[in-house]
């Protein structure tokens, strides 16, 4: 695969650190050269007349804000998914986006880009924050042309799979506490924080519980999902395969936000079960975990079960620095703090054991 981007004017040739986005087609052989038009965000692109875009490379120069809960990602990632189809509809030649991350390194961030329903799309690349700054500065002085050269191939779907393991409950094995993480990662790094750390956290927590003298009353089930990064296929497959068991799933949760320390406990319980949420938080408090809102997301790989009515919780991790590494060559073991990882395991083991060994239900009582 070739994924190259060069500034070729005014009067210079400067390589940029770039990565072709997932789903991007190839450029024509030898690449394409076009003038760049900059937009500060997707709203500006959507409002632009077609005449401002036709034949040009659209550059979305939106910065991502740093936040403990990662809230800036939901805003910034929109350009990665929507630049290509919107720019294509306006007649653009290609898309460039400022990397969806909070770092200032010369690393491009990888990730998926949407394709039009008929399968056509535009070449789309992410460029590093440093290169985005240079390009923006040059555009402030006048016209800039860029050459993009991508060779990419969209292959047929291949077989993936999930790994499922259980600690059978000693009294009510049909009742399930579901723990999830995903096995796949993007190609640029090691996948240590996305999501090797999640796999390690839930596996280590389950092992601690398994090694106790007495198993909990309910079954603890681990789902290590495949094919999350290209569409949450593993989690969706689990939902289809276990839909008939949804009523027996007591609660579900996923670790898929790196290895920053768990700082908040969020729930999505029925109003009648909120006293249980407060009891869990008190148990987690010695680990530095604060109470959170009753608005938990649960995680992508348990979303199918959530849609079937399964209560979810979030052991919310500190994501202040997560997007410095996310989907980049910097996603390595170096980015993981051992003390934070141990605190995650302790928090997961605490919640999961209590949820699996108690009699509580987090759903609304059945109507009589």
Can you say where each PLM-predicted feature lies in the sequence?
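Protein/peptide-recognition domains central to ubiquitin and immune signaling
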Residues: 1-16, 97-116, 160
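His/Asp/Glu-rich mid-to-C-terminal helical/loop segments that flank catalytic regions of hydrolases
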Residues: 207, 211, 218, 323-368
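Loop-rich non-cytosolic ectodomains and luminal regions
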Residues: 52, 84, 88-93, 97-144, ...
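Metal-dependent peptidase/peptidase-like ectodomains
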Residues: 13-14, 34, 122-127, 132-133, ...
């Amino acid at each position: 695969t070739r994924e190259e981007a060069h500034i070729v004017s005014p009067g210079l040739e400067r390589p940029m650190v770039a990565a072709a986005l997932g789903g991007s087609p190839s450029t024509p052989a030898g690449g394409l050269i076009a003038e760049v038009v900059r937009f500060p965000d997707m709203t500006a692109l959507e409002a632009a007349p077609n005449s401002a875009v036709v034949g040009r490379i659209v550059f979305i120069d939106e910065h991502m804000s740093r936040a403990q809960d990662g809230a800036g990602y939901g805003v910034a990632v929109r350009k990665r998914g929507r630049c290509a189809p919107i720019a294509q509809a306006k007649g653009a030649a290609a898309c460039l986006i400022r990397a969806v991350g909070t770092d200032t390194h010369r690393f491009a961030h990888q990730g998926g880009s949407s394709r039009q329903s008929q399968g056509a799309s535009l070449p789309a690349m992410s460029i590093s924050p440093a290169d985005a700054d240079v390009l923006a500065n040059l555009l402030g002085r006048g016209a800039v042309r860029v050459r993009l050269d991508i060779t990419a191939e969209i292959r047929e779907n291949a077989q993936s799979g999930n790994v499922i393991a259980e600690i059978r409950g000693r009294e009510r094995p049909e009742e399930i506490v579901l723990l999830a993480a995903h096995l796949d990662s993007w190609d640029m790094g090691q996948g240590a924080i996305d999501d090797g750390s999640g796999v390690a956290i839930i596996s280590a927590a389950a092992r601690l519980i398994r090694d106790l003298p007495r198993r909990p009353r309910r079954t603890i089930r681990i789902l290590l999902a495949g094919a999350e990064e290209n569409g949450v296929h593993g989690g969706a497959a689990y939902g289809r395969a276990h839909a008939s068991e949804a009523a027996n799933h007591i609660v579900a949760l996923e670790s898929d936000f790196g290895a920053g320390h768990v700082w908040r406990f969020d729930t999505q319980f029925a109003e009648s079960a909120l006293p249980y949420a407060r009891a869990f938080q008190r148990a987690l408090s010695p680990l530095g975990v604060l109470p959170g809102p009753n608005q938990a997301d649960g995680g992508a790989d348990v979303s199918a079960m959530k849609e079937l009515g399964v209560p979810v919780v979030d052991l919310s991790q500190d994501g202040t620095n997560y997007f410095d590494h996310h989907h980049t060559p910097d996603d390595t073991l170096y980015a993981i703090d051992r003390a934070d990882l141990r605190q995650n395991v302790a928090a997961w083991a605490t919640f999961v054991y209590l949820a699996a060994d108690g009699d509580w239900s987090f759903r609304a009582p059945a109507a009589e």
